[in-house]
Amino acid sequence: MLSHTEMKQGKRVLIDDQPWIIVKADFVKPGKGQAFTKIKVKNLMDGRVIERTFKSSDSVAKADVVDVEMQYLYNDGELYHFMNPATFEQVALSEKQVEECKKWLKENEVYEVTLWENRAINVVPPSFMILEITECEPGVRGDTVTGATKPAVVESGASIKVPLFVEIGARVKVDTRTGEYMERAKG
């Protein structure tokens, strides 16, 4: 059980018999009255976001979820298949479950899959990925305003902004949390 003071961003809790992740937690101690914690939680099953308030005497159960590194194999049109490289066990996630991560899916890459009651319920991409540029406009010579960017599409299908010198076929490091270009890939 988590007391109201242990409710922090990133903790996973069980509310209404479903796993949720705390997105935001604010501890409030009013001048008069009882202290409370206001949390914003996201359902790991369906992505809904709700707010809940817990008094200082309240507690909430921890969600018994496990994060496992799994390799993305393929999409059969309906389900996205992942494999645990250690046990070769395979799991499948629906389109809705991979919705936030779909634009970063690349075959044979390793992702963090969340399991609850031995079912895959969520997938998170690595923080940084090295991807190849498949579409972008050519950089015009002399068009070198400091910090200028142009739209580009990477091999996973995500759209990002890249500096003018980046060409089709270049490999770039991308922050998947923000969708921002970081640097050219080394090697």
Swiss-Prot record:
Q: Which Gene3D superfamilies match?
A: 2.30.30.30, Nucleic acid-binding proteins
- Domain of life from the UniProt record: Bacteria
The cross-references to InterPro entries, in alphabetical order and at most eight, read:
Elong-fact-P_C, NA-bd_OB-fold, Rib_uL2_dom2, Transl_elong_fac_P/YeiP, Transl_elong_KOW-like, Transl_elong_P/YeiP_cen, Transl_elong_P/YeiP_CS, Transl_elongation_fac_P
Biological process annotations from GO? peptide biosynthetic process
Keyword field contains Cytoplasm: yes
Question: A cellular component term (GO) from this record?
Answer: cytoplasm
What sections of the protein cross the membrane? none
In terms of SUPFAM superfamilies, this protein maps to: Nucleic acid-binding proteins (SSF50249), Translation proteins SH3-like domain (SSF50104)
The protein's UniProt keywords, in alphabetical order, are: Cytoplasm, Elongation factor, Protein biosynthesis
Against Pfam families, the record matches this protein to: EFP (PF01132), EFP_N (PF08207), Elong-fact-P_C (PF09285)
Q: In which pathway does it act?
A: Protein biosynthesis; polypeptide chain elongation
Q: Which cysteines are joined by disulfide bonds?
A: none
Q: Where in the cell is it found?
A: Cytoplasm
Picking any one GO molecular function of the record gives: translation elongation factor activity
Family membership: Belongs to the elongation factor P family.
**What is the role of the protein in this entry?**
Involved in peptide bond synthesis. Stimulates efficient translation and peptide-bond synthesis on native or reconstituted 70S ribosomes in vitro. Probably functions indirectly by altering the affinity of the ribosome for aminoacyl-tRNA, thus increasing their reactivity as acceptors for peptidyl transferase.
Name listed for the protein in its UniProt record: Elongation factor P
